[in-house]
Amino acid sequence: ILPTYNSAYTNDDLMALYSYTGGVAEYVEMMMDAGATTKEQMTERFIAKNSYFIYEGKNMLIEEFGKDYARYFEILQLIASGYTTRGEIESIMKIELSGYLTKLENDYSLISRYIPMFQKTNRNIRYQIEDNFLRVWFRYIYKYGYMIEVGANKKLKMVMDKSYTTYTGKVLERYFIAKMIESEEYTQIASWWDRKGENEIDIIAADELEQKVIFYEVKRQAKDINLGILKDKAEHFFQATGKFKKFDIGYQGLSMEDM
């Protein structure tokens, strides 16, 4: 739909549309109808004083969570801000969270737990918000709601611009994983990281029937992709898991240019 409204759109514009709307048709139409067809315009529209998006996250969830909504909102805000392990979240909130995390995952289907590919234990778990819109809403609107209350929307945009590159890098990974699942070309798709977090592989996609596996590095800009480092990380993966050593192995970079 973006080319219809902006024939000169860039990959960054497309990335922004996906990040802010999650591809939800209603949200996409709101952006287009408001004339927000570039990354800058979309950011401004997302946090505008009369923006529908400012209240949407709260309207979606506050009744569902009931009286405990503030605690659930804080957990989701921390996950959206990059605190993705139970230990990290508990150290900030100073409470035991297993019950809340279980409900967010199983009852509300708002978060999912991820473990490194082929890990057999429940250690090294990371949590993610599944809905792209809610992820960005908690990351910026809820977290910095106090800025919106005093009309400091321009200041909030500065905050968003500062962290936008890092934030959308993770969104880009999710985009490519979703596309790979849609392609039905692979029997296994996952990420991998070691216990210390020193070696991390963005995407591993394998076809067990064809005995093929591709290790992917995802970067916003193609110039930042380093396949040499990716191969080194794959060696750590082989040593840690013992998997895919006899497969036909490939290494590939993905960037916004591949969207």
Predicted regions: what is each one?
Residues 1-139:
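Interdomain hinge/linker elements that couple catalytic modules in large macromolecular machines
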Residues 117, 124-259:
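A cross-kingdom feature that marks ATP-driven nucleic-acid transaction machinery
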